[in-house]
Swiss-Prot record:
UniProt cross-references to PROSITE patterns, sorted A to Z: CYTF
Chain positions recorded as heme binding sites: 36, 56, 59-60
Gene that encodes it: petA
Name of the featured protein: Cytochrome f
The keyword DNA damage is annotated on this UniProt entry: no
Length: 320
């Protein structure tokens, strides 16, 4: 009887442990996969600082190019494409959080003018849906529908990101006017070098925190190193911790200086930002312009006809 109770108790404990492990895995995986947007959204009320710098550059230190393409002008209540290109060498591999090498992810933030927002699914054409693929965009804040974030997503598949945008209608939104507006964009490829709390990731170079001699280099079981540096002047010992990923550049017995690189820089990615302009065009102005062009063309036609008629009259008079 006691054996049965013991077995039942053990079985119950095992089920609880497995359930807790699964929950932790799901929560952890979700937080990692959503890391890029969450880092920016949690740390900053607005992703664009007063200086014009997009805050993603605070964590992604390398500067890389991006390209944004939008129509020159759009009509009110119209769906259009904003195409962001994040170019990089597809053969490159980045250092992952566990120190291993893997493909680069990309992410982006698109800052639209007030009133512009992500197009609803029922307004997106089949052709545009095909260009978008399986991307899932989200607003930076519930009250900031004009700021969109995406990522991290696989760079090999989404180095070109198509945003479906709905233009506002000044007839229904009184704070929107027919004007030229700026659009700002930021795009990254690869992991960042600094976390939002200021700590370093393993995707950056590690420097010596003291001048001295490398007394000992201990290779850790799960990867990475502990480097013991002894100051020759006072015998003070400092231990620098190197996470898995960066390659070591120093050896035991070597003299080093403060801030001297202890590792290579494994970062192959970077962040870039750009801007574009778009005109919210008044349909009446377009109609007026078309009417003007039509008037000019008709005037030219009538002028040609009148000239030919005059030439015929002259020719007729000359025959008499």
């Amino acid at each position: 009887m006691e054996n049965r109770k013991t077995f039942s108790w053990l079985k119950e404990q095992m089920i609880r442990s497995i359930s807790v492990s699964i929950m932790i895995y799901v929560i952890t995986r979700t937080s990692i996969s959503n890391a890029y947007p969450i880092f920016a959204q949690q740390g900053y009320e607005n992703p664009r600082e007063a200086t014009g710098r997009i805050v993603c550059a605070n964590c992604h230190l390398a500067n890389k190019p991006v390209d944004i393409e939008v129509p020159q002008a759009v009509l009110p209540d119209t769906v259009f494409e904003a195409v962001l290109r994040i170019p990089y060498d597809m053969q490159l591999k980045q250092v992952l959080a566990n120190g291993k090498k893997g493909g680069l992810n990309v992410g982006a933030v698109l800052i639209l003018p007030e009133g512009f927002e992500l197009a609803p699914p029922d307004r997106i054409s089949p052709e545009l849906k095909e260009k978008i693929g399986n991307l899932s965009f989200q607003s930076y804040r519930p009250n900031k529908k004009n700021i969109l974030v995406i990522g991290p997503v696989p760079g090999k598949k989404y180095s070109e990101i198509v945003f479906p945008i709905l233009s506002p209608d000044p007839a229904t939104k009184k704070d929107v006017h027919f004007l030229k507006y700026p659009i700002y964009v930021g795009g990254n490829r690869g992991r960042g070098q600094i976390y939002p709390d200021g700590s370093k990731s393993n995707n950056t170079v590690y420097n010596a925190t003291s001048t001295g001699i490398v007394k000992k280099i201990l290779r850790k079981e799960k990867g990475g190193y502990e480097i013991s540096i002894v100051d020759a002047s006072d015998g003070r010992q400092v231990i620098d911790i190197i996470p898995p990923g960066p390659e070591l550049l120093v050896s035991e017995g070597e003299s080093i200086k403060l801030d001297q690189p202890l590792t290579s820089n494994p970062n192959v990615g970077g962040f870039g930002q750009g801007d574009a302009e778009i005109v919210l065009q008044d349909p009446l102005r377009v109609q007026g312009l078309l009417f003007f062009f039509a008037s000019v063309i008709l005037a030219q036609v009538f002028l040609v006809l009148k000239k030919k008629q005059f030439e015929k009259v002259q020719l007729y008079e000359m025959n008499f």
